[in-house]
Structures are given as structure tokens and as C-alpha cells.
């Protein structure tokens, strides 16, 4: 049985990117072909030369909301609120950071004005009702703070409002960015189109659960967080057309892989809207994509386990060792990989 510790690697703290590069597509890109071919050190801007006419790039078009709020309990204790998802115009599922748990009926006096009341609790999530001056989504866009990942040790600024968002973000609802998509700027997209590469989109609203660690030793005992996603009929037809013409389906990010795999029915991609708790780790066979662009992920994380299922655990850990030796930048604002699948029988 696979253990969490099977996905450990040593990462120097200074390789964790604390902010974006001035140019999105200037990030480095490690090409990881199927074994035994060697890794290649490239740049994201090289993608038009690495892809082929007829390939289909699939992006996640979710848009990050400024989902972080601050307030205090009636008793005076400080509270941090992180919106997980909206339920109507004035209710939301949230995570709370506070010295003591809140109970049903407790109020939070919000620094930005108004208050929220606890309606219920399910594990680490709370249901809050917000008494604020406008619909919650609109109000947050004015007063909320962008929820940068916990390994970025600084407060967000106005630059993050632009750069912790993809250039094609349109479907509001994520509390974390689909980070592989952050590398694509308009210039790179234009060059890819000129190359004959097509674009398709899914929506998966990345939740705060993406940062939750695996807390059990054996992977089979881990319960994955739930996220809302949509795979539309238009994308399904694009995938079928790409396959028919001999093109490759290339996922931009692990969220795209999770969405496509969750929408597979009897070996075929089907339109789907709903929740997914799919947990992909080695032993699972990913059939929906032929390659993937992805950032470098945290040790022992479910995202690292997903890419290991695709490219092979040994291959991925070797690639990460190479990335550390070559001083790649890691995590959300870091560099990327272009991964191809493991060979049959490869671990």
C-alpha cells in the first residue's frame, strides 16, 4: 500500500516563489517526456515549438474571488473568515480561524462593515449568513482580500489581484488560482493559435481544501475535499474532434485532469455539472489527457500524487530532484512542467 511518505522530497525554503516574475511566460518549463528520454530545461514561451498543430489545450476558466475577511467576536476575539463557496446572495460556506470555535447563533462583527451569523457547522466548515450592504459576491469584490496560499509569507497587494488570476478567468467562484494557467499571457496564446493549437475550457472552482495536507499515513484512508466543476458539451465535442484528427488533449493544470476524469462515463468524456471528490494517485489510470502542463507541488500533497499517477512516481521524484538541483521556482507563483505519461508497467 502506498504511504504519504512515499511522496516526500526535500525542498530548500528559498526555492518557494514568493511572487510572480515580471512576465508570465518567462517562467521556466521542464519537459518531462516518457522514459527513458532525458528531461529538458525550457521556458513556458517555448510551448508553441513543443506542441503540434491540431493539439487541444484545455484550461480552467475559474476566477478567484477576494475571499478573505477579518472581524471579531462579540466577546472581542479576532476572527479570520475564508469563503469556500456561495450559497445564494447572502450565505456562504466558510472556514474560520479563531482562538475558540464558534457556535450556532454566534455573530462575527466584520471589519469592513456589517456582520455574519453562524447558522451551522460541518467539520471544519461553517455556514454563515451575512448582513452586508450588497449581495455577498459583489460586496467581497469591493472589500475582500485575496487569499494567497499559506506558503507565501507576505500580505497580498494590488499586483496580486492581477497576477494571481489567469488572463482567461471568467467564472467567479475559486478561492485559489488554477496555477498552471497563470503562465499564459495574450502573446503566448496568440503564438499558440498561429501554431494551430486549439483551446478549450472547463470550470472547476478551486476550494481552500486544495491546501489541506493529507493527515493519514495510508493513501487509501484519505478523504478528498469536494469541488464544483463543469465540463460542457462544447468541450466534449472539441475533445472528440481533436482525437479524430490525431491531435493530443493537453490539460493545463491538475484541476483540468480532475474535471475530465470525473466526467468520464464508460470510457467516454460526457458533459457534466456537479461535485467531484475524485482522488487520483498511482494505481489510477488517467485516460482523458495525453499530456499536462502543471506547476511544482508540495511534498506529500494530493496534487503531487496526481501527477505521479500520470507520469510515474519514480519519474516525478527524479524530475523534482532535477528541479531542485537546477534551482527551479516552486508552487503557485513558480515554474512549470510539461509532462507526458508513464510507460506501461512503470512505477
Swiss-Prot record:
Swiss-Prot/TrEMBL catalytic activity: 7-aminomethyl-7-carbaguanosine(34) in tRNA + S-adenosyl-L-methionine = epoxyqueuosine(34) in tRNA + adenine + L-methionine + 2 H(+)
Signal sequence coordinates: none
Name of one Pfam family that matches: Queuosine_synth
Gene3D superfamilies membership: QueA-like
Keywords: Cytoplasm, Queuosine biosynthesis, S-adenosyl-L-methionine, Transferase
Broad class of the protein's primary localization: cytoplasm
Location in the cell: Cytoplasm
Pathway: tRNA modification; tRNA-queuosine biosynthesis
Enzyme class: transferase
GO cellular component, one term: cytoplasm
E.C. numbers: 2.4.99.17
GO biological process, one term: tRNA wobble guanine modification
Keyword Cell division in annotation: no
GO molecular function: S-adenosylmethionine:tRNA ribosyltransferase-isomerase activity
Role of this protein: Transfers and isomerizes the ribose moiety from AdoMet to the 7-aminomethyl group of 7-deazaguanine (preQ1-tRNA) to give epoxyqueuosine (oQ-tRNA).
Homology family: Belongs to the QueA family.
HAMAP family listed in its UniProt record: QueA
Quaternary context: Monomer.
Record-given protein name: S-adenosylmethionine:tRNA ribosyltransferase-isomerase
Amino acid at each position: 500500500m502506498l504511504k504519504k511518505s512515499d511522496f516526500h522530497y526535500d525542498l530548500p525554503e528559498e526555492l518557494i516563489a514568493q511572487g510572480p516574475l515580471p512576465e508570465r511566460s518567462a517562467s521556466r518549463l521542464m519537459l518531462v517526456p516518457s522514459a527513458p528520454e532525458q528531461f529538458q530545461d525550457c521556458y513556458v514561451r517555448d510551448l508553441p515549438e513543443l506542441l503540434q498543430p491540431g493539439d487541444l489545450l484545455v484550461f480552467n476558466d475559474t476566477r478567484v474571488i477576494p475571499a478573505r475577511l477579518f472581524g471579531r467576536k462579540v466577546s472581542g476575539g479576532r476572527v479570520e473568515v475564508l469563503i469556500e463557496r456561495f450559497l445564494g446572495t447572502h450565505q456562504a460556506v466558510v472556514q474560520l480561524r479563531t482562538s475558540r470555535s464558534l457556535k450556532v447563533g454566534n455573530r462575527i462583527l466584520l471589519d469592513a462593515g456589517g456582520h455574519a451569523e453562524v447558522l451551522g457547522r460541518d467539520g471544519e466548515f461553517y455556514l454563515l449568513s451575512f448582513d452586508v450592504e450588497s449581495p455577498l459576491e459583489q460586496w467581497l469584490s469591493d472589500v475582500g482580500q485575496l487569499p494567497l496560499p499559506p506558503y507565501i509569507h507576505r500580505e497580498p497587494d494590488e499586483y496580486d489581484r492581477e497576477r494571481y488570476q489567469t488572463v482567461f478567468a471568467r467564472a467567479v467562484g475559486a478561492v485559489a488560482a488554477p496555477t498552471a494557467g497563470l503562465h499564459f499571457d495574450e502573446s503566448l496564446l496568440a503564438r499558440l493559435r498561429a501554431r494551430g493549437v486549439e483551446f478549450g475550457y472547463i470550470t472547476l472552482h478551486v476550494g481552500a481544501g486544495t491546501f489541506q495536507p493529507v493527515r493519514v499515513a495510508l493513501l487509501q484512508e484519505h478523504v478528498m475535499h469536494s469541488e464544483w466543476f463543469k465540463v460542457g458539451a462544447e468541450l466534449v465535442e472539441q475533445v472528440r474532434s481533436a482525437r479524430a484528427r490525431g491531435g493530443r488533449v493537453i490539460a493545463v493544470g491538475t484541476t483540468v485532469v480532475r474535471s475530465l476524469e470525473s466526467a468520464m462515463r464508460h470510457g467516454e468524456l460526457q458533459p457534466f455539472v456537479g461535485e467531484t471528490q475524485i482522488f487520483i494517485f498511482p494505481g489510477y489510470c488517467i485516460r482523458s489527457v495525453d499530456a499536462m502542463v502543471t506547476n511544482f507541488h508540495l511534498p506529500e500533497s494530493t496534487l503531487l500524487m496526481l501527477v505521479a499517477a500520470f507520469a510515474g512516481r519514480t519519474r516525478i521524484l527524479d524530475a523534482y530532484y532535477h528541479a531542485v538541483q537546477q534551482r527551479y521556482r516552486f508552487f503557485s507563483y513558480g515554474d512549470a512542467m510539461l509532462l507526458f505519461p508513464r510507460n506501461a508497467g512503470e512505477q
